[in-house]
Amino acid sequence: GCNAIYREFMPHVLVATDRLIANKIQEEGIDKKIKFWTRRPIQGSKALKIERPYYGNSSGPVALSRACIDGATHVFLLGFDFGSTDDKFNNVYADTEFYKKSTDKPTFAGNWIYQINEIAKAFPRVTFFRVKDQSFSDVDFTNNNIVNIMMDEFKLKINKL
């Protein structure tokens, strides 16, 4: 999982690349309970340092790369909407600590798309499933191993794995 998802439930692995939320995660001791990856671990923490070539990537792409490095053959991208339908910041954690306001402009998604394409290219035997709904923007991925599926199809697939 990425960033503030630990507020909802404790994932097995967590990634945060933005320093403020990464520091908060370490200060709360989350890095001692689960595997936590960040760019700059606080000295004395159990956080793991993101290595190159993924060091400069955003949290979502780093999480994808970690899943691949750890041997996943199917990676499901949940919450990767890559855009906004109303020109506003669309994040489930908008208006909370470390996040923009829901009325702010959306974050540019081009970097995420580029980073995910590069990861998919580096791991051609992994199938990436972008789970979307009707409101998600279409994205033209350059790799054949990135597939768009709807939420209903995801539920069927995940229950078979």
Regions found by a protein language model. Name each.
Residues 1-161:
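Metal-ion/cofactor- or nucleotide/acyl-coenzyme-handling active-site neighborhoods
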